[in-house]
UniProtKB/Swiss-Prot annotation:
Residues holding Fe cation: H111, H115, D300
Main location: cytoplasm
Native source species: Salmonella typhimurium (strain LT2 / SGSC1412 / ATCC 700720)
Cystine connections: none
UniProt GO BP: tRNA threonylcarbamoyladenosine modification
A single GO cellular-component term on record: cytoplasm
Catalytic activity: L-threonylcarbamoyladenylate + adenosine(37) in tRNA = N(6)-L-threonylcarbamoyladenosine(37) in tRNA + AMP + H(+)
Entry's Gene Ontology molecular function annotations: iron ion binding; N(6)-L-threonylcarbamoyladenine synthase activity
Protein name per Swiss-Prot or TrEMBL: tRNA N6-adenosine threonylcarbamoyltransferase
Signal peptide: none
Keyword set includes Metal-binding: yes
């Protein structure tokens, strides 16, 4: 079975083809980073227009990469939410139209389920059950996962997501968009311990997060200590250490409360090397395992949508003739497969 996956939830156009026997056959990705850089963030209208320009050419490129034609595709999966409504509508409209034209099923996919299942694309995929840390620009959630669609929300950010806090703090440090990866690079040159940031909400029970205060703390630290290059690097290091430690502490609590031995990390921030190293060290001490996708599958991509679409199709999920997207869509609302 071959599934074409279409991802257009934000500022990446991702197209991929997944075969349930051979694995990933094609993966095409176009990033709009340069388009939005001058604005310091994603401009929804510009994102939608660029998806219109890029989606069909990338589908053609994916078919060529895989050596396939339209007649070889058994289903079309597309991101139906959450995300930017205009961007979602582009991918959903193209996906639904192609499915109708090719006389194959259309499969709406939850963007965050795509991220959650991305580690399944690797040679050593995790087995159920596990605790999932979904950490990106729009979400920071801890989820108990006992099967496909069997998701229990354990905790989430009550304000900024971790990735959003990275980007906002990077902007305070004078870094360009997207700031998260640039902040991490700057942090690698920083001196540990010169500045100490709080670890929000770790001094109380529970698994929720709060990162907006770290941005304010960073702004005050920058204002009080000047902005020479080394000081900025030291502040970046302190900020990253605070976020990573907070995520690690909450993951440890989630593992203790569930009794699970496996931790899955997914989403754009899961590509952070410091976070990966700290969680790997923690899980080794706990005699458990940590799983994550390769870096190119941590950020938005079509491969995770194609894979999640295949899983959902085998569970009997298909779309009707309408084109429906959900900019807000709780993961817990998905049915079990």
């Amino acid at each position: 079975m071959r599934v074409l996956g279409i991802e257009t939830s934000c500022d990446e156009t991702g197209i991929a083809i997944y075969d349930d026997k051979k694995g990933l056959l094609a993966n095409q990705l176009y990033s709009q980073v340069k388009l939005h850089a001058d604005y310091g963030g994603v401009v929804p209208e510009l994102a939608s227009r660029d998806h219109v320009r890029k989606t069909v050419p990338l589908i053609q490129a994916a078919l060529k990469e895989a050596g396939l034609t339209a007649s070889d595709i058994d289903a079309v999966a597309y991101t139906a939410g959450p995300g930017l409504v205009g961007a979602l509508l582009v991918g959903a409209t193209v996906g639904r139209s192609l499915a109708f034209a090719w006389n194959v099923p259309a499969i709406p996919v939850h963007h965050m389920e795509g991220h959650l299942l991305a580690p399944m694309l690797e040679d050593n995929p995790p087995e159920f059950p596990f605790v999932a840390l979904l950490v990106s620009g729009g979400h920071t959630q801890l989820i108990s996962v006992t099967g496909i669609g069997q998701y229990e929300l354990l905790g989430e950010s009550i304000d900024d997501a971790a990735g959003e806090a990275f980007d906002k703090t990077a902007k305070l440090l004078g870094l360009d968009y997207p700031g998260g990866p640039m902040l991490s690079k700057m942090a690698s040159q920083g001196t540990a311990g010169r500045f100490v940031f709080p670890r929000p909400m770790t001094d109380r029970p529970g698994l929720d997060f709060s990162f907006s205060g770290l941005k304010t703390f960073a702004a005050n630290t920058i204002r009080s200590n000047g902005g020479d290059e080394q000081t900025r690097a030291d502040i970046a290091r302190a900020f990253e250490d605070a976020v990573v430690d907070t995520l690690m502490i909450k993951c440890k609590r989630a593992l203790e409360s569930t009794g699970f031995k496996r931790l899955v990390m997914a989403g754009g921030v899961s590509a952070n090397r410091t976070l990966r190293a700290k969680l790997a060290e923690m899980m080794q001490k706990r005699r458990g395992e940590v799983f994550y996708a390769r870096p190119e599958f941590c950020t938005d991509n079509g491969a995770m949508i194609a894979y999640a679409g295949m899983v959902r199709f085998k569970a009997g999920v298909t779309a009707d003739l309408g084109v429906t997207v959900r900019p807000r869509w709780p993961l817990a609302e998905l049915p079990a497969a």
